[in-house]
């Protein structure tokens, strides 16, 4: 069942529930002279951004919530990420918005104070930790994501080899592709953002150090140069094309090279498993691969909270807001409507409800499970700041493209990355 079909079923359920609860409420009205036991009416506001499907899902889940708790009314606003209402009582937030600074600590309620309302035990501790700043839980994670390898095994079969599981096999695959299939075939292809993630994974694997800790870059320019040489080796061994050769309009899954199998692998978000599979002209060979251990010091790479729900510190009814958050993420009724509209649920009960409703793609679960079982590091909140990660003008894209195209040496590129990242981190620390 897809999200749209499930939404139609959910809407019918909401209507039936509303009638049932209304009848119940009429029967239970206080007799003359008796004190009313009905709570005082409460109005909450909630904001989010996303596509039409996400908006429809939120609206239907909120209708179910209002039908269940008829004394609470939820007024909603939605649009784009740039114009989200920052004053709403309950906010969908990008995890990086928390900023891990004093400003965000003052904007949102510490949800630890409402652990009697929100069942925090349903969420992974690592995701809760990622939403915690100076001991305050500023948001509850809706979903956690990370990158993993996807392979088109049909192309590998044509080359006479298996999809790679080690760095050595990856390098060998590049040369085999060139010799057997030709110059236009590559085992891997990915954009600058994915290459930056892959480089950090390599460095963390070989050094055992997190990329950033305590708002400090943990790598010197010389160490970053080693990571850039790793990317360069992948290009030189025909594992992946240069960024100049790979320039495309749109995402990789939209390119003929991915669709027809010339690009036989990528390093992408677990949530995109079905996107890459369904884009293939022959999807029978699609495989969720294993993470590759590039070194023996750690399992490099990281997971990140995709989206979270926070309660504004200006909220006049924080307990009722917490009840709404718990309904959407943990309760069967809410979570079975929300499904995967905001990513694969991190909540155990939420994921179970979404799965029972037929809204969870097994490929995404497989990709998420493999990624989560491997990676040792959380994502630093500044890693995806616009100054660094924006495409095409962010530091990562500019430097990695110039290095890939030969406009910068690995030494020059490493120095620019170290200086630019340190400048962004210094700005965060100074706030």
List each model region and its residues:
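Conserved N-terminal structural module of periplasmic/extracytoplasmic solute-binding proteins
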Residues: 10-105, 163, 336, 408, ...
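Alpha-to-beta junction loops
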Residues: 84-96, 184, 259-269
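Extracytoplasmic/periplasmic solute-binding protein
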Residues: 138-142, 147, 171-223, 232
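Glycine-centered hinge/linker elements that transmit conformational signals in sensory
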Residues: 216-246, 291
């Amino acid at each position: 069942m897809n999200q749209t079909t499930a939404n139609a079923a959910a809407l019918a359920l909401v209507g039936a529930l509303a009638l049932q609860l209304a009848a119940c409420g009429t029967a239970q009205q206080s007799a003359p002279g008796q004190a009313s036991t009905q709570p005082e009416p409460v109005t909450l506001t909630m904001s989010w951004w996303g596509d039409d499907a996400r908006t429809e899902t939120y609206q239907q889940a909120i209708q179910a919530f209002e039908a269940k708790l008829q004394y609470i009314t939820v007024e909603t606003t939605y649009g784009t990420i740039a114009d989200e209402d920052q004053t709403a009582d309950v906010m969908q937030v990008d995890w990086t918005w928390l900023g891990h600074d004093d400003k965000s600590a003052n904007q949102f309620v510490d949800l630890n104070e409402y652990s009697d309302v929100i069942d925090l035990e349903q969420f992974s501790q690592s995701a809760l930790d990622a939403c915690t700043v100076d001991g305050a839980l500023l948001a509850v994670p809706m979903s956690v994501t990370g990158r993993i390898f996807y392979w088109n095994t049909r192309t590998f079969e044509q080359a006479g080899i298996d999809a790679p599981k080690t760095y050595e096999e990856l390098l060998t695959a590049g040369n085999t592709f060139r010799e057997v299939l030709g110059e236009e075939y590559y085992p891997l292809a990915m954009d600058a953002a994915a290459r930056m993630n892959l480089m950090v994974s390599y460095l963390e694997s070989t050094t055992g150090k997190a990329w950033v800790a305590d708002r400090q870059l943990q790598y010197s320019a010389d160490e970053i140069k080693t990571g850039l040489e790793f990317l360069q080796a992948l290009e030189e061994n025909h594992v992946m094309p240069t960024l100049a050769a790979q320039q495309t309009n749109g995402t990789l899954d939209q390119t003929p090279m991915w669709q027809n199998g010339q690009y036989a692998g990528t390093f992408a978000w677990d949530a995109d498993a079905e996107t890459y599979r369904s884009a293939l002209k022959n999807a029978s060979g699609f495989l969720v691969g294993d993470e590759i251990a590039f070194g023996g010091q750690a399992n490099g790479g990281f997971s990140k909270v995709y989206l979270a729900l926070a309660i504004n510190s200006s909220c006049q009814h924080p307990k009722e807001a917490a009840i709404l958050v718990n309904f959407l993420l943990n309760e069967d009724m809410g979570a079975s409507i929300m499904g995967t509209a905001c990513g694969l649920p991190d909540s155990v009960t939420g994921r179970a409800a979404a799965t029972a409703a037929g809204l969870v793609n097994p490929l995404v679960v497989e990709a998420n499970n493999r990624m989560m079982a491997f990676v040792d590091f959380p994502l630093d909140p500044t890693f995806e700041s616009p100054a660094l990660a924006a495409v095409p003008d962010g530091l990562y894209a500019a430097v990695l493209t110039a290095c890939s195209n030969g406009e910068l040496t690995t030494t020059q590129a490493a120095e620019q990355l170290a200086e630019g990242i340190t400048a962004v981190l210094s700005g965060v620390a100074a706030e």
